[in-house]
Amino acid sequence: MNSHFASAHTPFYINTKEGRYLVLKAVKVCDVRTVECEGSKASCVLKVDKPSSPACERRPSSPSRCERMNNPRKQVPFMRTDMLQNMFAANRDNVASRLLN
């Protein structure tokens, strides 16, 4: 990456007249001059398109306790992690048997 650029990985909020925006990734640019402009006179103002969906609604807060903590006997199902290994082994065995026959 160029030495003039630094990436900010921490999400943050920007409060604007239109609402609050969550910035997931930002790029900091160094050694770039700032052009002052007034929104009523200039065309260099950031354009923000209004969302077509209804305004954001606050969701109720999540429950304070995890469901797993309430029922310790209930086991969490795990996905088979050896699935790819078994697929490759079966493919290898099929190819080997074809070559030997």
Curated annotation (Swiss-Prot):
Record field: compositional bias (Basic and acidic residues): 56-70
Modification note: Phosphorylated on two serines. While these phosphorylations do not play a role in virion assembly; they are essential for the interaction with host RICTOR and RPTOR.
Modified residues (Phosphoserine): 53, 62
Compartments where found: Virion
Domain of life: Viruses
Keywords: DNA-binding, Host-virus interaction, Inhibition of host innate immune response by virus, Late protein, Phosphoprotein, Viral immunoevasion, Virion
Main location: virion
Keyword Glycosyltransferase: no
Region named Disordered: 51-73
One record GO biological process: symbiont-mediated suppression of host innate immune response
InterPro entries: Phosphoprotein_F17
Family (UniProt): Belongs to the orthopoxvirus OPG062 family.
Quaternary structure and partners: Self-associates to form high molecular-weight forms. Interacts with protein OPG157/A30. Interacts with host RICTOR and RPTOR; these interactions disrupt the mTORC1 and mTORC2 crosstalk.
Misc note: Originally annotated as the product of the F18R open reading frame (protein F18), it is now referred as protein F17 since there are only 17 open reading frames in the HindIII fragment.
Protein name: Phosphoprotein OPG062
